[in-house]
Design a protein with these regions (language model features):
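Conserved pre-ATP/AMP-binding loop-to-beta segment of ANL
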Residues: 33-36, 162-186, 196, 200, ...
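Conserved AMP-binding/adenylate-forming core of the ANL superfamily
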Residues: 38-74, 78-91, 112-120, 168, ...
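AMP-binding/adenylate-forming catalytic core of the ANL superfamily
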Residues: 131, 263, 270, 411, ...
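Conserved AMP-binding/adenylation subdomain of ANL enzymes
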Residues: 200-216, 226-268, 283-287
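Gly/Ser/Thr-rich phosphate-binding loop
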Residues: 267-271, 283-373, 387-389, 395-396
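Conserved ANL (AMP-binding/adenylate-forming) active-site segment centered on the GW(Y/F)…HTG consensus within
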Residues: 359-377, 397, 414-443, 476
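Conserved beta-loop-beta connector loops within the AMP-binding
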Residues: 365-382, 387-408, 450
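Conserved C-terminal "lid"/linker of ANL adenylate-forming enzymes
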Residues: 489-493, 504-505, 528-578
Length: 578
C-alpha cells in the first residue's frame, strides 16, 4: 500500500474509542461536503439506469434525520431491522440506525423472491424494536412484524432533524448483526462490534488500495451480504471514497451494466463471486465491449466461493481488449464471522496458481503435481492485517506449511459470536492456540504453501452456488417433506463444475412410490421445483436410490462425505434423472 493510501485511511483514526461508521460519515461530510458519496443506478425505472446521487453532506443530513426519529422510538442497543430495497435509502437506513446507537440488522425488502421464510426466521431471532423501510414497502413490512413490538419508520419520509448529541458507544458495543445461514429454521446472526467493522473496513481499504479522491467502489452485491455491506458502505466510510451501487437483479439481467459502471468510475474497486466473472464474460456482447474502458480499474476481488483459474482466464480474455490489466484480479478469502475479509493476493501481481497432486492433497499434503492427476488451486494470498494459522482441529495445534488443516483467524475484525447462541459461539469463537486466546475456527480447510493461503474445501458442509450459501440440512429437510422421498434418507452436497459449484441431492425413494421411470421423473420435477422455490437453488443433479442404499455412518447417520465421494466416482451414474 502506498504512503498516501495509508495516510488517507488512517487520517480519521485518532479517536478509536468513539469512532463508528456514522461518526466517520460526519467527518467526511465536513471535509468533502458537496462531493458525491453515493450513486445508485436505478434499472427498475429506466433501462439506461437512471443515476441518483447523494453528496457527503446530503447523506450525513439524511442519516441524522433517520437517527433522530429512530432515537425517539428505540433505546441504544435495541435492534433495528433494515428492510429496504437495494438503493441509496438502504445506506441511509443502515447508517441511521448506527448513529442512533442501535444494533442494525441488514436484511432486505419483503418483496425479494424466495426469501420470506428466512426473513420471518431472522426477525423472530433478532426481535427488532424498529423496522426501517421505505414508503412503498410499508404495507408488506407490516405483514412480517408485530406492531406491538416493532415500530415502523419509512426513511424516505423522515423530515430533516435539528442538531443534537448522539450516543457515544464503546468500541466493543454491537454495530450490527450479520445473518449468514440463509436457513428458514436456524438463522445465525454474527455479532459485529464497531471495532470489528472499522478494523475490517480499514484492512480492506489497505489491501485494495483505496485512496480518498482517487478511487471509488462499484458494487451490485446485496447490501445485506457481508461482502456487499463492507464494499458498498463500510469501506467507503473508512476511506472517504464514493460508491456506485446497482441492484443484483440489474446485474443478472445484463452483466454489461456492471462493466459499464466500472468503465465510468475512475479508480474502480469491485468484488463479485467467481460465477459472476464467467457469467459476464459469456453474456457481454462485442458491441457492448466496444464502449468499455477498463484500464482505470484498480482491483477486482474474486471471493465468496471457490476461485477457478479457468474463470479468471475467461474474464481476462473477454475484457483484456478493453484495457483490463490482468494484475487487477485479486483472489480473496473471507467469512462473515471475521466481518468479511481475511486474506487477499498482493496488489499488482496476478494470482498464483498451483497444480497440486490430487491424491496427496486429498490425503492432507500440498505437493506440486508430477505426471499424475492434479487439482489446480488459486492462491488467496496473505492475511490482511490479521493472524492466520492452519490447524489440526481435533488436536487444536498448528500444522506445518504444506499440510492441510482448518483455517483459524485472529484479529480485531473477528466477531464476538453468534447472537443468542452461546453454545455454538463457544465452539467457534475465542479459541486458544499457541498460548493465545481469541482465535476463530472458520470451518474451512486450507493450506499454506510458499507463505500463501490456498483454500482446499469446507469442513462445514456448506453448499455454495452462485455466491450464495445453502446449508445441506435445509435442502434435505425440504426434499424429505415430499411424499416420494423416504424420511431421513437425503444427502445434499456440492460438486465442482467448470463454472463454479453445483448442488446435488442423493435420496432414497419412499417404499410406497410405484416403480417406473415416469413416476420417478414426475417426483424429480416436483422436488426440483420445491427446492428452487424454497431456496432459490437450481439442482445440478438429483439421484433416486432404493431404500437403504444411501451411505450411512456406523451410528446410522447419513454420510454426506461418503455419498459425495461415491457420486464423484460414478457409482450413481445409472440412477441419474437429469
Amino acid at each position: 500500500m502506498t504512503t498516501s493510501a495509508a495516510a488517507s485511511v488512517a487520517e480519521f483514526s485518532d479517536h478509536a474509542t468513539t469512532e463508528t461508521l456514522a461518526t466517520l460519515l460526519h467527518d467526511w461530510a465536513a471535509r468533502l461536503g458537496d462531493e458525491i458519496a453515493v450513486t445508485f443506478l436505478d434499472y427498475r425505472t429506466s433501462d439506461d439506469g437512471r443515476a441518483g446521487f447523494l453528496t457527503w453532506r446530503e447523506l450525513d443530513d439524511r442519516v441524522s434525520a433517520v437517527a433522530a426519529r429512530a432515537a425517539e422510538l428505540a433505546a441504544p442497543g435495541e435492534r433495528a431491522a433494515v428492510l429496504v430495497e437495494q438503493s441509496a435509502d438502504y445506506v441511509v437506513a443502515f447508517l441511521g440506525a448506527i448513529r442512533a446507537g442501535l444494533v442494525a440488522v441488514p436484511l432486505f425488502a419483503p418483496n425479494l423472491p424466495g426469501h420470506a421464510g428466512r426473513l420471518t426466521a431472522v426477525l423472530a431471532d433478532c426481535d427488532p424494536r424498529l423496522a426501517l423501510t421505505t414508503a412503498p414497502q410499508l404495507d408488506q413490512v407490516r405483514e412480517f412484524v408485530d406492531p406491538k413490538r416493532t415500530e415502523l419508520v419509512a426513511v424516505d419520509l423522515v423530515p430533516p432533524a435539528r442538531e443534537r448529541e448522539w450516543p457515544v458507544p464503546e468500541p466493543d458495543d454491537l454495530a450490527y448483526l450479520q445473518y449468514t445461514s440463509g436457513s428458514t429454521r436456524s438463522p445465525a446472526g454474527v455479532m459485529l462490534s464497531h471495532r470489528n467493522v472499522l478494523a475490517n473496513a480499514r484492512q480492506a481499504c489497505a489491501a485494495y488500495g483505496a485512496v480518498t479522491g482517487r478511487t471509488t467502489t462499484v458494487s451490485w452485491l446485496p447490501l445485506f451480504h457481508d461482502m456487499g455491506l463492507v464494499l458498498g458502505i463500510a469501506a467507503p466510510m473508512a476511506a472517504g471514497i464514493g460508491t456506485t451501487l446497482l441492484d443484483p437483479v440489474a446485474f443478472l439481467e445484463s452483466p454489461g451494466r456492471w462493466l459499464r459502471a466500472l468503465s465510468a468510475s475512475p479508480g474502480a474497486i469491485s468484488a463479485a463471486p467467481n460465477f459472476a466473472y464467467g457469467y459476464s464474460a459469456s453474456r457481454v456482447s462485442e458491441r457492448e465491449k466496444s464502449y468499455l474502458e477498463l484500464s482505470r480499474v484498480v482491483s477486482l476481488i474474486n471471493g465468496s466461493e471457490p476461485v477457478l483459474p479457468s474463470t479468471i482466464a475467461q474474464f481476462q480474455a473477454a475484457f483484456g481488449g478493453c484495457g483490463l490489466d490482468p494484475a487487477v484480479h485479486r483472489a480473496s478469502y473471507g467469512l462473515a464471522e471475521a466481518t468479511v475479509l481475511v486474506s487477499v493476493t498482493d496488489a499488482g501481481e496476478p494470482s498464483r496458481q498451483v497444480a497440486f497432486d490430487r491424491d496427496r492433497l486429498a490425503a492432507g499434503a500440498a505437493v506440486p503435481a508430477g505426471s499424475g492427476a492434479s487439482s489446480t488451486l488459486v492462491s488467496c494470498g496473505h492475511a490482511a492485517g490479521q493472524q492466520l494459522r492452519i490447524v489440526d482441529p481435533e488436536k487444536r495445534q498448528a500444522v506445518p506449511d504444506g499440510k492441510v488443516g482448518e483455517i483459524w483467524v485472529r484479529g480485531e475484525n473477528v466477531g464476538r459470536g453468534y447472537w443468542r447462541n452461546p453454545t455454538t459461539s463457544a465452539e467457534t469463537f475465542g479459541l486458544r492456540l499457541d498460548g493465545t486466546d481469541g482465535w476463530l475456527a472458520t470451518g474451512d480447510l486450507g493450506v499454506l504453501f510458499d507463505g500463501e493461503l490456498y483454500v482446499t474445501g469446507r469442513r462445514k458442509d456448506l453448499v455454495i452456488v452462485d455466491g450464495r450459501n445453502h446449508y445441506p440440512q435445509d435442502i434435505e429437510q425440504t426434499v424429505e417433506a415430499h411424499p416420494a422421498v423416504r424420511r431421513h434418507s437425503a444427502a445434499a452436497f456440492a460438486i465442482p463444475l467448470d463454472e463454479g459449484e453445483g448442488a446435488v441431492v442423493v435420496l432414497e425413494r419412499a417404499k410406497n412410490l410405484a416403480d417406473g421411470e415416469a413416476n420417478l421423473t414426475a417426483a424429480a420435477e416436483g422436488l426440483r421445483a420445491e427446492v428452487a422455490a424454497r431456496h432459490g437453488l437450481k439442482l445440478t443433479d438429483l439421484v433416486f436410490l432404493a431404500p437403504g442404499e444411501v451411505p450411512r455412518t456406523s451410528s446410522g447417520k447419513i454420510s454426506r462425505s461418503a455419498c459425495r465421494a461415491r457420486y464423484l466416482d460414478g457409482a450413481f451414474a445409472d440412477r441419474r434423472l437429469s
